[in-house]
Amino acid sequence: QTLYSDLFLDGFYSTSMARNNSFIKDYNFFDSFAFTESALGVGIDRIQEISKNDTSNIYFRGYNYNISKSKETEKTYEINLEYDFKLSSQFSGKIKFGTKKRTKFRSFDQNNDDGVPDEANALCGMLNEFPEYFSEYIGLCGSSGITRIPFYPYIDYEYDPRVFFNGRYSMGPKADTDLMNDIFHYFRKNWNKNNSNQAAPEAVVHVFHETSSILYDYKGKENYKADYLMIDMNLGQKLNITTGARIEKNTTQYQSYNAWASVIPSFVFLGDSTLHNRENDYVLPSLFLRYKPVSWLNIRFAKTNTLTRPNYADILPLQYISTGNQSIEYKNTEMEPGKSENLDFSIAFNQKHLGLFSIGRFEKNISGLIYSSGRRYVDDPTKYGLTDNLEGYMINDYKTNNPYTVKLRGWEFDYQTRFWYLPGPFSGLVLNANYTVTESEVKYPRTEIYYEIDFGPPLVAQTMNIDSFYVDRLIDQPNEIFNLSIGYDYKGFSGRLSVLSKSDIFMQTNFWRELRQTTDDYTRWDLSVKQILPVKGLEIFLNINNITEAVDKNRYYTSNSLSLEQHYGKTIDLGFKFSF
């Protein structure tokens, strides 16, 4: 909106809502003697070799039904006011300021049913309910043999596993899903009718798990507000300076649970709802310089500050305390955002025949990066917001801000050109190439639990945290990325063949070096083609993604064994697009 000839106002308001409902049933079968040798520390290829696959020794051991429902609503508005000025032919620019506010509401509700129908009466009831599947085993009712019904009657003999992972791995037989769902509903309906051991309340066949159905529920609200002021100045025709600052304020309020493990967690939840408020604000200055001494040379410099906020799931006020093994499931509500100071410098050359070539250097210094150091001994409960009686307990997975600064450095080379000067149809050729190389160094803190015993007399035992670190690359950061695109534009036709190649990526940290993970190198080819048709606004397009069907693979550091392999395959989109 133009208020005056040199004063402009704009703004927007948006609202959104997202729901995600999940209904998952797990049916568990167990084989006590599944392998011909120990499977500990063995890769998946070796697992396939030592598996017995003896269905006569596989038994039904229960099920789990999880229902989770999440909801997130967001409302955002933004207002910007801009004033353009020109004090002289050598000094002009604009002043701009504005505000943005975003409010989020989140909720999560989980319910969990499970059952362990391993008692004779329960299984006998199941056999009689589904005689078409278990007729040959009904005669076992009243004997101990009924608890060892093999996998055969559960098998879905019409299931076709097809070729899994290019035939490298055998999936084996699968249980009949329809039968298993019917068994689930049968025991859910007859949860207390098929068990002779009614003296123990937990011995019923089917239970609604009180603890897991309440403990992980949460709801909360986040308010984000940002105000900024910037000035964009042109000093003559060659120099542009843009500077300013953004003030960010973030407040969160989340409700979760503090609980103690009861003797029978499935029947009794020992916990109370708790509410936690947190607030932080930051001033984030920035500076951008652009100098263009001649028409074919462009020099840029930028100094900025950015934040990486912790995942909301990591700052819930959740505590679950188990007295049996003196352990705590713990979320750190005091984690702060990680802050990055960024420096970017680039120089670009532009010539009408050669095209555009640029070289860039970037640096990032990240403080307060969020990490997990593994287990931690509670030597002083006040450090973690815990009560005094929890001294000596163990936090299972302790996340906090990294006290060491993370350093990331890199170079970027970019080339873009169009061969417009070639004769005839060759003038439509297009070439784009980009190469980025980075190096990073991160000190990942590592906590070892040290036990010291003085046999005295008197006997004295002491437990302590030994904090150290190991050095590795920044997580999720490849050392090299290469993009190349070859295209052709002629009249109403446009096509691009592109390739993306990146080196291995450090994917997962871990206390144990053997469990840290990296990806394999990755190369992917894509094709995009479109043709304008002789109807105004109509075009036909073809997109082929992952032409060579590249595979994502993660591997453990030391053994080179696969930890994850994902086949996304090739996708082809063919269609029409109409613009009006």
Residue ranges and their predicted role:
Residues 363-365, 370, 383-506:
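Gram-negative outer-membrane beta-barrel transporters
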Residues 2-6, 69, 73-75, 85, ...:
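Transmembrane beta-strands of outer-membrane beta-barrel pores
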Residues 86-95, 110, 237-238, 296, ...:
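Short loop/turn motifs that connect adjacent beta-strands in outer-membrane beta-barrel proteins
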Residues 501-510, 530-580:
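C-terminal beta-signal and adjacent terminal beta-strands/loops
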Residues 1, 9, 93-99, 241-245, ...:
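Transmembrane beta-strands of outer-membrane beta-barrel proteins
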Residues 17-61, 122-215, 376-399, 458-468:
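Flexible glycine-rich, low-complexity coil/linker segments exposed to the extracellular/periplasmic environment
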Residues 220-222, 278, 307-366, 385-419, ...:
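Outer-membrane beta-barrel signature, preferentially recognizing the C-terminal barrel domain
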Residues 1-12, 50-52, 62-68, 72-87, ...:
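Surface-exposed extracellular loop regions of Gram-negative outer-membrane beta-barrel proteins
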